[in-house]
């Protein structure tokens, strides 16, 4: 039997395999998607003929709809090609679907194996990178018994860098690509306190959210103020007499107001 449309499979499966869609949940975080439970092999589809394109389309549709249970059942029903030629499992949509199922079932070892051994196209990178990082975050949280803070997540990212199979090789810092950070720095030099409109414009230009843009500017202002305070302290230690100190000691800013930012300025991001 050959299906004209990918989702014809789902309708046909209800007739040929009544329990395919209505079977009780079989996914658990302790079971690998590569090893279905006992008796589950009866869900294989003898006599049904799918093209590789149709199988890929079914995987993509079920992935997009978020139906992980049915996606897992469909993957387990696929035949195993033992001769290694034109294997269905080598199709990117099938590999990505297996990675999605492994992630949602907590089979992180299997997820890492899939991501490290199959080279994915750029279109899949963003989603797979997010799964790679989130899986490592969850494992670290479970090991430490507490939620991870920003520094903890940074250390996890340094310990488990993205594999080149899901990464284009461009250097990243705090998950922002270098070209994104360069654009942020250019705007910061022009205006370290962008209004909501400018934040939205910059967010559109960088692919970030307005909140991410606002947080980056806030953190950059804090770092600049800390560096300015350190420089003033070092200057005071070198020239302790009043002649060398900055004029207007009760002010937290330089007289020109350009070199240092005021510590009293608001860093609120409520206007995002």
Swiss-Prot record:
Its main location: nucleus. Pfam families: Homeodomain (PF00046), SIX1_SD (PF16878). The keyword DNA-binding applies. The keyword Nucleus applies. Keywords: Developmental protein, DNA-binding, Homeobox, Nucleus, Repressor, Transcription, Transcription regulation. GO terms for cellular component: nucleus; transcription regulator complex. InterPro entries: HD (IPR001356), Homeodomain-like_sf (IPR009057), SIX1_SD (IPR031701). Residues 169-228 bind DNA. SMART domains: HOX. One of its GO terms (molecular function) is transcription corepressor binding. It is found in: Nucleus. Residues 244-272 are annotated as: Disordered. GO terms for biological process: apoptotic process involved in development; cell proliferation in forebrain; epithelial cell maturation; eye development; forebrain dorsal/ventral pattern formation; lens development in camera-type eye; lens fiber cell apoptotic process; lens fiber cell differentiation. Interacts with GMNN. Transcriptional regulator which can act as both a transcriptional repressor and activator by binding a ATTA homeodomain core recognition sequence on these target genes. During forebrain development represses WNT1 expression allowing zona limitans intrathalamica formation and thereby ensuring proper anterio-posterior patterning of the diencephalon and formation of the rostral diencephalon. Acts as a direct upstream activator of SHH expression in the rostral diencephalon ventral midline and that in turn SHH maintains its expression. Belongs to the SIX/Sine oculis homeobox family. This is Homeobox protein SIX3. It comes from Oryzias latipes (Japanese rice fish).
């Amino acid at each position: 039997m050959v299906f004209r449309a990918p989702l014809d499979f789902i309708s046909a499966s209800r007739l040929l395999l009544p329990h395919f869609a209505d079977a009780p949940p079989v996914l658990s975080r302790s079971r690998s998607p590569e090893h279905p439970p006992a008796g589950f092999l009866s869900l294989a589809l003898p006599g049904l003929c799918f093209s590789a394109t149709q199988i890929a389309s079914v995987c993509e549709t079920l992935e997009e709809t978020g139906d992980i249970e049915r996606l897992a059942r469909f993957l387990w029903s696929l035949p195993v090609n033992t001769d290694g030629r034109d294997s269905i499992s080598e199709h990117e949509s099938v590999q990505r679907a297996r990675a999605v199922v492994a992630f949602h079932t907590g089979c992180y070892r299997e997820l890492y194996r899939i991501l490290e051994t199959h080279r994915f196209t750029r279109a899949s990178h963003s989603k797979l990178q997010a799964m790679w990082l989130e899986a490592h975050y969850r494992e670290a949280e479970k090991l430490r018994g507490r939620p991870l803070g920003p520094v903890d997540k940074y250390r996890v990212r340094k310990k488990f860098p993205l594999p080149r199979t899901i990464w284009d090789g461009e250097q990243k810092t705090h998950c922002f690509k270098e070209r994104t950070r360069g654009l942020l720095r250019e705007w910061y030099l022009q205006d370290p306190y962008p209004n909501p409109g400018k934040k939205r414009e910059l967010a559109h230009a960088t692919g970030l959210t307005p909140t991410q843009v606002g947080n980056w500017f806030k953190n950059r202002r804090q770092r600049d103020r800390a560096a300015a305070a350190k420089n003033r302290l070092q200057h005071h230690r070198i020239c302790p007499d009043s002649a060398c100190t900055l004029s207007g000691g009760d002010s937290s800013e330089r007289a020109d107001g350009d070199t240092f930012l005021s510590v009293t300025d608001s860093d609120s991001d409520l206007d995002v």
